[in-house]
From Swiss-Prot:
This is NAD(P)H-quinone oxidoreductase subunit J, chloroplastic. GO terms for cellular component: chloroplast thylakoid membrane. Gene3D superfamilies: NADH:ubiquinone oxidoreductase, 30kDa subunit. Its EC number is 7.1.1.-. The keyword Translocase applies.
């Protein structure tokens, strides 16, 4: 079943794939990495002015990595704002997705966390560097094929 936003994107010739609706009835769409930045700008202009959250996950061992964006269309006088979930999949070997920092500034730390934990590189992000792990850390701890080291250096917190 095609949702309202999917129908609007089709009407305007914007390439995407409908993934249906989640358990709360929120429309979920898949966007290709190369189309993501331009569609993000279009969604912002269309009224999706609030990025509620961004996260990422490892789809399967050796498989794709996904970056997920939850957007809300906040309008004056509307009790129930329209929401959409966007999924952008990227290959594990060289995961690159355009950053939407310049569209929604609130994605800054969230994209950095996704980079730090899964190794997804967000192109044109102004400060893409590790945020949780030390700069010297090797690997991406939330990937399903990550092998944890058998030792951890405990650092003094003083």
């Amino acid at each position: 079943m095609q949702g309202r936003l999917s129908a609007w994107l089709v009407k305007h010739g914007l390439i995407h794939r409908s993934l249906g609706f989640d358990y709360q009835g929120i429309e979920t769409l898949q966007i290709k990495p190369e189309d993501w930045h331009s569609i993000a700008v279009i969604l912002y202009i269309y009224g999706y002015n609030y990025l509620r959250s961004q996260c990422a996950y490892d789809v399967a061992p050796g498989g794709l990595l996904a970056s997920v964006y939850h957007l809300t269309r906040i309008e004056y006088g509307v009790d129930q704002p329209e929401e959409v979930c966007i999924k952008v999949f990227s290959p594990r070997k060289n995961p690159r997705i355009p950053s939407v920092f310049w569209v929604w500034k609130g994605v800054d730390f969230q994209e950095r966390e996704s980079f730090d934990m899964l190794g997804i590189s967000y192109d044109n992000h102004p400060r893409l560097k590790r945020i949780l792990m030390p700069e010297s850390w090797i690997g991406w701890p939330l990937r399903k094929d990550y092998i944890a080291p058998n030792f951890y250096e405990i650092q003094d917190a003083h």
